[in-house]
């Protein structure tokens, strides 16, 4: 749907839920409209209210997306374990939900948790979309967290090659990985490139000044 229709969708779904409170689709579309408006609290409330009306007859595609977005929202609010539970539910309904697999794997890697599981989930995403820079970056970062630096370099280089938007995160990861592979000059070069895109990043400034990887 078009962005300008979001408020109309919210109003329609609110009315429809009064007449048919057991229809999961109304909670889904209302939640997604709130999400598109960046109204995350209202979106999360809509999704939480909708959980109770999910049945075995519900659309796996919709329910999977339902839990995926819910997981993203919960993680943004710092509710890590609730987010992981939502991602688990998402993957029960659709085991090959690539977006969920990537986000779940990346968040686990950032926390340094369940790295073997994260690697398995992330590998599915790069198998499905081998030129997706975001997915390649996630996989590279998981290998980095596993101290598999030479392997991680292979995938971060693929991520950098396919990164059409020149993400500061991917570029910074490239610098981190290069540094742990012993390539200090290229590490500093990538950190400097990342800083151009994210000039307020104090950790990047320290990395460049010290010419050293700093764990966050």
Label every PLM stretch briefly:
Residues 26, 60, 66, 100, ...:
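TPR alpha-solenoid repeat register
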Residues 21, 55, 95, 130, ...:
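Short coil turns that delineate tetratricopeptide repeat
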Residues 29, 62, 69, 103, ...:
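Canonical tetratricopeptide repeat
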Residues 4, 38, 78, 112-113, ...:
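Residue-level detector of the short coil/turn that links helix A to helix B
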Residues 32, 72, 106-107, 141, ...:
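Residue-level recognition of tetratricopeptide repeat
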Residues 1, 35, 68, 75, ...:
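Position-specific recognition of the canonical hydrophobic site in helix A of tetratricopeptide repeat
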């Amino acid at each position: 749907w078009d962005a300008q229709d979001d408020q109309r969708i919210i109003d329609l779904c609110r009315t429809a839920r009064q007449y048919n409170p057991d229809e999961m689709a109304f909670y889904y579309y209302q939640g997604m409209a709130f999400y598109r408006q960046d109204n995350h609290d209202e979106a999360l409330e809509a999704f939480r209210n909708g959980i109770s009306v999910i049945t075995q007859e519900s659309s796996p595609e919709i329910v999977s997306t339902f839990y995926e977005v819910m997981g993203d929202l919960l993680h943004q609010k710092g509710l890590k374990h609730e987010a992981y539970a939502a991602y688990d539910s998402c993957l029960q309904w659709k085991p090959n939900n690539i977006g969920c697999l990537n986000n779940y794997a990346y968040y686990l890697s950032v926390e340094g948790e369940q790295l073997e599981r994260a690697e398995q989930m992330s590998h599915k995403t790069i198998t499905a979309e081998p030129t997706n820079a975001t997915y390649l970056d996630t996989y590279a970062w998981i290998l980095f967290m596993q101290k598999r630096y030479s392997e991680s370099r292979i995938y971060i280089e693929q991520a950098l090659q396919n990164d059409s938007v020149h993400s500061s995160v991917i570029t910074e990861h490239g610098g981190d990985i290069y540094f742990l592979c012993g390539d200090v000059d290229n590490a500093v070069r990538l950190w400097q490139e990342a800083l151009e895109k994210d000039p307020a990043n104090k950790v990047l400034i320290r990395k460049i000044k010290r010419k050293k990887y700093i764990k966050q």
